């Protein structure tokens, strides 16, 4: 996994609730060529959505996702981009909680 994602940006949006997270994920994937790699139910109703792609695309996607999330209500908690995550960060992303896969 690490070899195919090295040098690819990581975008994250954390929301209060599932509806803003879905809205953000939809907006991110429509706004730029990014791959929706996962979601994490953090607890207490918080959901984090993660995308990967080229830095410019991830930047545009996270901005669009954050804007869409704010339109749903006050669901946006945080939005952040890591341009090139260190290889030591990659195992933390591989939690098996990816969209489209059965648990």
Curated annotation (Swiss-Prot):
Molecular function via GO? structural constituent of carboxysome shell
Under the heading Pfam families, the entry gives: BMC
Q: Which PROSITE patterns match?
A: BMC_1, BMC_2
What keywords sit in the KW lines?
Answer: Bacterial microcompartment, Carbon dioxide fixation, Carboxysome, Photosynthesis
Q: Name one GO biological process term.
A: carbon fixation
Q: Which locations, inside or outside the cell, does it occupy?
A: Carboxysome
Does Aminoacyl-tRNA synthetase count among this protein's keywords? no
Q: Which InterPro entries does the record match to this protein?
A: Bact_microcomp_CS, BMC_dom, BMC_shell, CcmK-like_sf, CcmK/CsoS1_BMC
Q: One GO cellular component term, please give it.
A: carboxysome
Q: Which residue numbers delimit the BMC domain?
A: 9-94
What's the subunit arrangement here? Homohexamer with a small central pore. Forms a CsoS2-CsoS1-RuBisCO complex.
Q: Which function does this protein serve?
A: One of the shell proteins of the carboxysome, a polyhedral inclusion where RuBisCO (ribulose bisphosphate carboxylase, ccbL-ccbS) is sequestered. Assembles into hexamers which make sheets that form the facets of the polyhedral carboxysome.
UniProt lists the family membership as follows:
Belongs to the bacterial microcompartments protein family. CsoS1 subfamily.
Q: What free text does the record give on domains?
A: The tight homohexamer forms a pore with an opening of about 5 Angstroms in diameter.
- Name under which the protein is recorded: Carboxysome shell protein CsoS1
Q: Which organism is it from?
A: Prochlorococcus marinus (strain MIT 9313)
| Upper taxonomic lineage | Bacteria, Bacillati, Cyanobacteriota, Cyanophyceae, Synechococcales
Q: What gene codes for this chain? A: csoS1
